[in-house]
Amino acid sequence: ANPFILSLGSKETATRRLNLAQAFNPMGSLSGMAVASFIVLPQLWSDRRDAAGKLLFSTLSEAEKADIRLHDLAVIRDPYVAIGLVVLAILVIIAITRMPKTQTDNAELTNVRATLSNLWHNRIYREGVATQMFYVAAQIMTWTFIIQYADYLGIDKATAQKYNILAMTLFLSGRFISTFLMKYINTRRLLMLFAIGAAICSLGAIFIVGIVGLYSLVGISIFMSLMFPTIYGIALENVDAKDTALGAAFLVMAIVGGALMPPLQGLIIDQYQVFGLPAVNASFVLP
């Protein structure tokens, strides 16, 4: 879908179009978090506690536990059924909609070896793939460990999840804000300014111990908002139409960075202190 969006108009506005299209992705993530936090979790009987805060589930008979499992399964199942129906409806709409022809549809096919050679010798593309890999790693680390950061401050997990929702809300808002700003500010310059903002917030998350540090961590999300689609668009700017499909595939594969780096951050968090800082704070040196 991303190469399709890039090819639908002029190259000058391609990255802006992609940012606008990608602005709808966080809506799904935010909706999922909201459904889990405000609809699913409060209805789970297995999570009920007594006045002392202890789970009641372990004190029940096997028959009562079986009833609770069936109830909780239904609570969790129903949202997925609804999502499946919505996805099916979207699939039908796409199937019956005539898509416009694009530059990539008319491009001549070339062999894989030639395409790989073209991509490898394109410096902007090559650096774009590397940048995308490290960006995705930073994004996943930032979001994965918000709850651990809040937990260190004595904030319970239910409240900590709300900070996750706040981060995703800022991320969603940032996508629309950055799309608007691209009308007036050069795409590369805007990417640089947002990267500086993310770095400043990261320093706050590392060196400020307390609630201000937590808000700094959450604030990184607004600056991350434009990065994936903008890096993607810039990397493919000078790629020939015949090489776009494979080039786009490597950019998507760059998300492997999100799987490689979080375990390393987890190892740092497992330490008590690092250079005089709480380990959870120091771990954000990585992103």
Segments and roles (model prediction):
Residues 1-10, 225-241:
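Intracellular juxtamembrane helix-capping segments at the cytosolic ends
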Residues 13-45, 56-57, 249-262:
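Glycine-rich segments within core transmembrane alpha-helices of 12-TM secondary carriers
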Residues 32-45, 118-165:
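Extracytoplasmic gate region of multi-pass secondary transporters
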Residues 40, 174-187, 269:
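Helix-to-loop junctions at the C-terminal end of transmembrane segments
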Residues 41-83, 264-287:
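A membrane-interface helix-boundary motif in multi-pass transporters
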Residues 100-128:
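Juxtamembrane intracellular "pre-TM" segments in multi-pass secondary transporters
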Residues 153-170, 246-249, 279-283:
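Loop-to-transmembrane helix entry
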Residues 189-204:
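Structural signature of the two symmetry-related core transmembrane helices
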